[in-house]
From Swiss-Prot:
Gene Ontology biological-process annotations: translation
Name this polypeptide is given: Small ribosomal subunit protein uS14
InterPro entries assigned: Ribosomal_uS14 (IPR001209), Ribosomal_uS14_bac/plastid (IPR023036), Ribosomal_uS14_CS (IPR018271)
Gene: rpsN
Keyword Ribosomal protein carried by entry: yes
Subunit structure: Part of the 30S ribosomal subunit. Contacts proteins S3 and S10.
Disulphides: none
Lineage: Bacteria, Pseudomonadati, Pseudomonadota, Gammaproteobacteria, Alteromonadales
GO cellular component, one term: cytoplasm
Domain of life the protein comes from: Bacteria
Function text: Binds 16S rRNA, required for the assembly of 30S particles and may also be responsible for determining the conformation of the 16S rRNA at the A site.
GO molecular function, one term: rRNA binding
Family: Belongs to the universal ribosomal protein uS14 family.
């Protein structure tokens, strides 16, 4: 079970990503535009570097909704492999059952 502070940190990161998404997108558009002057591009790079580090989507980590486990996460269910298996064995996941061939 992950510490509650780790779960809270991920929630905070998600809020920051949502808050700065438009600003980051605009700055990246300026940087990647080939017609932008070097001075404008450099200003955009500095502004992008000035944004909070946790506002980057690459710093987010998918976590199990029940335990907060960061590894073995299955996007379709929002659970780790362990909790998904437990729920499946209890019959709580419709349409999912143990493989047999």
């Amino acid at each position: 079970m992950a510490k509650s502070s780790m779960k809270a940190r991920e929630v905070k990161r998600a809020k920051l990503v949502a808050k700065f998404a438009e600003k980051r997108l605009a700055l990246k558009a300026i940087i990647n535009n080939p017609t932008t002057s070097d001075d404008d591009r450099w200003d955009a790079v500095l502004k992008l570097q000035g944004l909070p580090r946790d506002s980057s989507a690459a710093r987010q980590r998918n976590r199990c909704s029940q335990t907060g486990r960061p590894h073995g996460y299955l996007r379709k269910f929002g659970l780790s492999r362990i909790k998904l298996r437990e729920a499946t064995m209890r019959g709580e996941v419709p349409g999912l059952r143990k493989a047999s061939w």
